């Protein structure tokens, strides 16, 4: 229940504002630690990790950091947005990573307005998926999900990511419900190992949702593994 450390917030703010630092490094610093990393740190310190408490603490950290960086985030995102043709190299990749890290925080401040704009203007998959993730993370993005599916429905690899993204960013109390709905989607083929993993593995990867007190995710996972095991025991075992 502790608040985010003022020293941590100040340190991240200094890194965010320092234009002499490598953009890729600044992006890493702006990203919140993964829930799995937080759980491992707690376990190593002799504590029993609580997925729900970790989820709440991480959300609180994100809110505090977004508030601290609020004065600089819009200008940072604008500076890092390349309006010319897409180029792929280490420098531009670092700029995109920093832009999306800043966008994830800004989405907590502006309700997703900047993310919607970047999604609409995206000329590369990194920006498109990244902006969509930012929207899903704040409980929005349904129109963008529909547009994404309409555009990429014929690309299996991309659609695997579309399925997984929705579950990865689902709120704990909605994770099982969203996963169940996706297993009823016309493009969900449980006999396709990659599509099955994109959905069920993503469910297991959403720790707070998977371990929700309702037990709904446990039941859903068990039902699907029992169905898959006779046909594809190797995938079921994974």
Regions found by a protein language model. Give the residues of each.
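Long, ordered, helix-rich scaffold segments
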Residues: 1-238
């Amino acid at each position: 229940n502790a608040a985010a450390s003022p020293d941590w917030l100040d340190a991240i703010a200094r890194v965010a504002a320092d234009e002499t630092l490598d953009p890729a490094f600044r992006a890493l610093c702006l990203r919140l630690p993964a829930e799995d990393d937080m759980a491992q740190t707690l376990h190593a310190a002799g504590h029993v990790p609580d997925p729900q408490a970790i989820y709440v603490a991480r959300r609180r950290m994100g809110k505090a950091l977004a508030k601290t960086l609020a004065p600089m985030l819009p200008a940072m995102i604008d500076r890092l947005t390349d309006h010319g043709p897409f180029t792929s190299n280490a420098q531009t990749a670092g700029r995109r990573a920093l832009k999306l890290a800043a966008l994830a925080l800004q989405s907590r401040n502006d309700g997703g307005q900047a993310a919607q704009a970047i999604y609409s203007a995206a000329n590369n998959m990194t920006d498109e998926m990244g902006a969509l993730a930012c929207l899903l993370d704040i409980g929005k993005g349904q129109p963008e999900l529909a547009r994404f599916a309409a555009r990429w429905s014929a690309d299996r690899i991309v659609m695997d990511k579309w399925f997984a993204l929705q579950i990865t960013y689902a709120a704990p109390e909605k994770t099982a419900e969203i996963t169940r709905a996706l297993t009823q989607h016309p493009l969900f083929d449980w006999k396709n190992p990659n599509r099955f993993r994109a959905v069920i593995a993503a469910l297991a990867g959403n720790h707070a949702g998977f371990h929700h007190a309702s037990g709904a995710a446990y039941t859903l996972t068990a039902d699907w593994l029992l169905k898959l095991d006779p046909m594809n025991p190797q995938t079921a075992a994974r």
